[in-house]
């Protein structure tokens, strides 16, 4: 599968830069990141909380068929500008990774296309490098592909 989501991780830096263009208006791309029902579909996680506003918060989790929690994450929203920007923290629970800071920038390219740029900043280069050893690149690319397919039906 072609990796349409571009991931750049410069040596000796604490950040990952993610970019992806979508065949979606910027309003729909933004909605895909902020509407709990849509988020659940493309992220394949249950949204427990999503308070989309400055000083808001969010929480996701994924369970197996027996009800065991496989993944849980939460964060605080620091800035929320509709169709433009979200600045938030992101922390996975029950992992060695501390909270990271995420800057999500939404850009209109044309009436029907848009781009997201995500800058993720980690506590250290080592934590960033540990994240990159996981199937991170393939996972985010697959999630973005699902986002494109699911949200395209809303046009």
Where would I find each of the regions flagged by the language model?
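Hydrophobic/aromatic beta-strand elements that line small-molecule binding cavities or substrate pockets
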Residues: 20, 47-48, 72-79, 90, ...
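Hydrophobic pocket/interface hotspot
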Residues: 29-30, 39, 58, 77, ...
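A short, structured loop/turn motif at beta-sheet edges
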Residues: 26, 52-53, 78-84, 105-115
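Hydrophobic ligand-binding cavity/cleft-lining segments
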Residues: 1-46
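Short, solvent-exposed aromatic-acidic interface loops
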Residues: 91-98, 119-126
């Amino acid at each position: 599968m072609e990796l349409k989501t571009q991931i750049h991780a410069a040596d000796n830096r604490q950040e990952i830069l993610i970019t992806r263009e979508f065949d979606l208006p910027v309003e729909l791309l933004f909605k895909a990141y902020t509407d709990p029902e849509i988020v659940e579909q493309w992220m394949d996680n249950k949204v427990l909380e999503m308070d989309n506003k400055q000083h808001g918060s969010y929480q996701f989790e994924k369970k197996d068929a027996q009800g065991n929690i496989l993944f849980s994450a939460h964060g605080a929203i620091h800035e929320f500008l509709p169709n433009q920007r979200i600045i938030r923290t992101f922390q996975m629970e029950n992992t060695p990774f501390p909270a990271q800071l995420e800057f999500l920038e939404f850009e209109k390219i044309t009436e029907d296309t848009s781009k997201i740029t995500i800058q993720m900043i980690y506590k250290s280069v080592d934590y960033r490098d540990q994240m990159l050893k996981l199937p991170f690149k393939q996972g985010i690319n697959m999630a973005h592909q699902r986002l494109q397919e699911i949200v395209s039906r809303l046009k």
